[in-house]
Amino acid sequence: MRKSWKLGAVSVALVAALGLFGCSGGDTTEQKADKPAAPQTETQTPEAAEPESEAVELQIFAANSLTKAMAEAEELYTQQNPNVTFADTQYEASGTLNEMLGAGQYADILITASKGTMDDAAENGYVKEDTRQTMFNNDLVIVTKEGGDLAGRDISLEDIAAGKYTLAVGDENVPAGNYACQSLTTVGGYIEPDGATGADATGKGGEFSATLQPKVTLGGKVGDVCKYAESGEVDIAMVYTSDVYRMGGVAICSVVPNDTHKAITYPGAVCTDSKNAEAAQAFLEWCMTDEDANQIWEKWGFELAQN
C-alpha cells in the first residue's frame, strides 16, 4: 500500500514539472513567428567603395592663337573633372609645335591652326590619324593700332600690295602668315614658285613683290605680329579675329575675303606617344560638345567647326 502511494506521488510531481516548463521555458510556434530574428554573429562585409578616378595630367601643344581660350577651357575642365589636370601647355606657331614633336618632346594632344600643319604631323607619325577632327574656324583680318591714325579706315589687299602701309605677317612656320601670303597672291603682293594663287597657294616658299618686300616685318608667332601693330611699329598686321579678342590694343580695318586663302581651321588630335590617350580623347570630345566650353570659344572669337 505504501509502495503504491509513493509511485503516484512521483507521477504527480513529474506532470507538474512538465507543465511548469511549458509555461515558462519555451515559446509557442506563434510567439516564435512574432519574434524578430536574432542578429547574426558573423561579421558583415561592407560593400566596396567605388574606386576614385585615376589622376591624369595632360600635356597639350596648341597653336599660339589659342592661348587665352584654351587656358580658360582647361580650368573649367578640371573643375568638372578634378582627376584631370594640365601640364604647362605649350603655345607656339603650329610649325614650331611639329618641330618640337619631331625633336622628341612629349605631348598628349596637338591642336594646330591649319590643316596643312596637321597633315604634316600625321605624315610624320606624330598624331593618331583616327583621332583627328576639325575643332574651330577663324577669320583673317587686317588690324591697326587702336585709336591710331588708321583706325576706322577700310584697308584692302590692293592697298597693301601697292605698298601704302608697313605690314606685319607671320613667318612660314605661322599659319596666319601662310594665310596672309595666300591672300596676297591674288593681288600680286606675294609670288609663289609655281604661280599658284589664292586657296591653291601654300603661302610658303615664295617671295613678296619688290614693292611690298621693304614694307614687311615677319613675326615668329601670330601674337607677336599683333603686337607689332598694337605698338605702332608697323601700320597694319594680318592676324586672326580671335587675336583681336585675346591681345587687345588693335582695331579691325577689314576682314580678308575668305575666297582669297584656304579655309582657316584648327584640327586637333591625340599624339601617337600619348600615355593618356583615353583621357586626351575625352578632353577633345568635351571641347566640341560641352555648352560651357562652347561659350568660351565664342568669347575669344572662335567658331566651332561642323564636323
Positions of predicted regions on the chain:
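Hydrophobic helical h-region of N-terminal Sec-dependent signal peptides
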Residues: V10-A17
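Bacterial N-terminal signal peptides that target proteins for export
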Residues: M1-V10
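Short, glycine-/small- and polar/acidic-enriched structural segments
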Residues: R132-L140
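C-terminal motif of bacterial Sec signal peptides marking the signal peptidase cleavage site
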Residues: L18-G22
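Exported/periplasmic ABC-transporter solute-binding proteins
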Residues: S24-Q79, Q90-G95, G102, S114-K115, ...
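Short beta-strand-centered segments that line the small-molecule binding cleft or hinge
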Residues: D108-S114, M118-N124, K128-Q133
